[in-house]
């Protein structure tokens, strides 16, 4: 089984320019994800997809990284991560190997736990056929897509269950999905088919999209 750690790093960010190469505790956000991926013994390859010239220069000679330059049509504010993954994996599989499992590690989540990821991966491996596991935390934003948990699976909060006691939101720390799942649902999430891992630590739930988020991470 070939397991890929996938790190997407677009050059231009509307709300926080050049965020992927901004340094947190002396280390760029993308390098935080790269270093974490290297600690995962079950990962066979680390892929970076980017259109950022500085990131390309930084990793093009790395023996640990499979670097893929992202085309312009997949490097806009409207580009979906799943489209980037699909496009990149086609190139990867032609050149290297087939893919069974994708672990998405976004540079915007610099704080991660190896223990938690191993737990999530073990749960993922016990699932059958089409499967995915993603990280969530208690919801504090009614504007985001909110979920509740039923029979261990995530379900989207709708009009009929808005008053559900425990509501969660995807926090972006990690996503795990097999390639069949991604090809079929075009997402790491599908109702009644995705297992959530609840992160209680505040730092693990930090997702850097704005200057305020970055300042919060610096204080952590």
Can you name each region flagged by the protein language model?
Residues 1-17:
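N-terminal nucleotide-binding beta1-loop-alpha1 segment
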Residues 47, 53-103, 111-119:
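Short phosphate-binding loop-to-helix
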């Amino acid at each position: 089984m070939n397991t890929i750690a996938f790190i997407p790093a677009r050059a231009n960010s509307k709300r926080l320019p050049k965020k992927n190469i901004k340094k947190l505790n002396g280390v760029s956000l993308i390098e935080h994800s790269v270093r974490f991926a290297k600690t995962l013994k079950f990962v066979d390859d680390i892929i970076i997809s980017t259109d950022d010239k500085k990131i390309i220069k930084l990793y093009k000679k790395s023996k640990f990284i499979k670097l893929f330059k992202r085309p312009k049509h997949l490097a806009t504010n409207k580009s979906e991560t799943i489209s980037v993954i699909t496009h990149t994996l086609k190139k990867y599989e032609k050149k290297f190997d087939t893919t069974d499992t994708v672990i998405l590690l976004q540079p915007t989540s610099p704080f991660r736990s190896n223990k938690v990821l191993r737990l999530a991966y073990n749960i993922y491996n016990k699932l059958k056929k089409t499967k995915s596991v993603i990280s969530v935390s208690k919801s504090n934003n009614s504007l985001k897509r909110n979920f509740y948990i039923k029979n261990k699976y995530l379900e989207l909060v709708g009009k009929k269950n808005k008053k559900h006691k425990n509501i969660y939101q995807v926090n972006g720390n990690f996503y795990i999905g097999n390639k069949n799942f991604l090809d079929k649902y075009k997402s790491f999430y599908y109702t009644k088919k995705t297992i959530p891992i609840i992160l209680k630590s505040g730092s693990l739930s930090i997702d850097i999209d704005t200057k305020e988020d970055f300042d919060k991470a610096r204080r952590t």
